[in-house]
A protein has these predicted regions:
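Carboxylate/His-rich catalytic cores and anion/metal-binding grooves
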Residues: 40-55, 115-141, 327-331, 338-343
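Perimembrane helix-loop-helix junctions
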Residues: 201-253, 330-338
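Membrane-interface coil-to-helix junctions
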Residues: 23-113, 135, 140-158, 269, ...
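Membrane-helix interfacial "entry" motifs
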Residues: 6-7, 66-69, 94-103, 126, ...
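Periplasmic/ER-lumenal interhelical loops and adjacent helix-loop junctions
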Residues: 249-331
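Membrane-embedded helix bundles of polyisoprenyl
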Residues: 17-25, 77, 104-124, 128-215, ...
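Membrane-entry segments of alpha-helical transmembrane domains in multi-pass membrane proteins
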Residues: 11-15, 72-80, 97-107, 153-154, ...
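Start-transfer (signal-anchor) and selected internal transmembrane alpha helices
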Residues: 1-29, 235-245, 340-342
Length: 343
């Protein structure tokens, strides 16, 4: 009985709270029907239908969709991350139907992303900040826009792996262990296999995230103000030692996702993609005005040139306030001990 009691005592009740709070975000998905009017709602069903045709034909990775492009076919999953569709296909084969499978994956993406964020922040800062971060991550306005306005299946699933990649980077930088490097590699590969766009955006942020963590860790062991000409070279060597496992994990992640990433990068010139970047999709016409980040306006339309978009770009009052509070430790003389917890 003692081992069972110890296992029960180790269970974190906040996990249940994260799942319960996720119901506020996924409640509409639990109701009958399907949001056909959302931006990519039809596309998600079409993609799954074509993907299933390939699976039923015995093709484990169906890159070619024969019914697209007016029946001429199109290598859609050669350039579009297939992981979210693989998960939807599993639920379809279990009998959920096309629309049911898409709704299940959208709902699970919210729950899983909250649990992933909770695990990451708990490791760094503890349970209470982790619970706040997880709930905020699940219900920030953009996540709700992604689900109920854009119906962006792949992007919604990608946000499961964002905190896992951050967790992997933090763990690999704080302790040189094989499991940390492998975990980072699989998280980064899964993100690439889900959404190359989110991967690109996160990678740009990772540059600053990794630099800040590495410099902070190096400063703890060798304060910058004590650097001399003689100690500079050993300091740089130590900095490289800290960065090596992170770089190795990210490189291995790219290698693991090469089955998708390599054809996507080398063969995209053979596929017409200009219609994705021109006309109404031209990104140069969709820069957001500063006030739109704080505007409470909510719409179900699309982004148009100028500030009169019929879709929300708000950051959300609560996330902004929490972000400002998160900056307070920077003004303390002594950093929080939680940031140096072993990985």
């Amino acid at each position: 009985m003692q081992p069972a009691k110890r296992r029960a005592s180790r269970f974190d009740p906040n996990i249940l709270l994260v799942i319960l709070f996720s119901l506020f975000a996924i409640g509409p998905l639990l109701q009958p029907g399907y949001q056909w009017d959302a931006h990519d709602a039809r596309h998600s069903v079409y993609f799954l239908f074509e993907f299933d045709r390939g699976i039923q034909d015995g093709i484990p990775y169906p890159r070619w969709q024969p019914d697209f492009a007016f029946g001429y076919g199109y290598p859609f999953f050669n350039i579009y991350g297939p992981l979210a569709t693989y998960v939807a296909e599993a639920f379809y084969l279990l009998g959920a139907g096309y629309t049911g499978a898409v709704k299940i994956v959208l709902a699970l993406s919210v729950v899983a992303s909250g649990l992933a964020m909770y695990g990451f922040v708990k490791r760094v800062l503890g349970r209470r900040p982790a619970l706040v971060a997880a709930v905020a991550y699940m219900v920030i306005p953009y996540r709700l826009v992604d689900i109920y306005v854009r119906a962006a299946l792949a992007e919604s699933v990608a946000y499961v792996f964002v905190p896992l990649v951050l967790w992997g980077v933090w763990a690999a930088l704080h302790r040189l262990r094989l499991i940390n490097i492998v975990g980072l590699a699989f998280a980064y590969a899964a993100l690439m296999f889900t959404s190359p766009l989110v991967t690109l955006l996160l990678t740009l942020i990772l540059v600053f995230f990794i630099a800040a963590l590495a410099l902070a860790r190096a400063n703890d062991e060798q304060p910058f103000r004590q650097l001399t000409r003689e100690s500079l070279l050993p300091f740089l060597g130590h900095l490289g030692h800290l960065l090596f496992p992170v770089a190795l994990g990210l490189i291995l992640g790219v290698c693991l996702s090469a089955v998708f990433a390599l054809p996507a990068m080398t063969e995209s010139r053979f596929v017409r993609v200009d219609q994705w970047y021109g006309g109404r999709y031209a990104w140069g016409s969709d820069f957001v005005e500063f006030f739109q980040l704080f505007s409470p306006r909510w719409g179900f339309g699309v982004s148009v040139p100028g500030p009169e978009d019929d879709v929300s770009f708000q950051l959300g009052v609560v996330p902004v306030v929490l972000s400002l509070f998160a900056l307070l430790p920077l003004f303390r003389k002594k950093p929080r001990a939680g940031l140096d917890r072993p990985a």
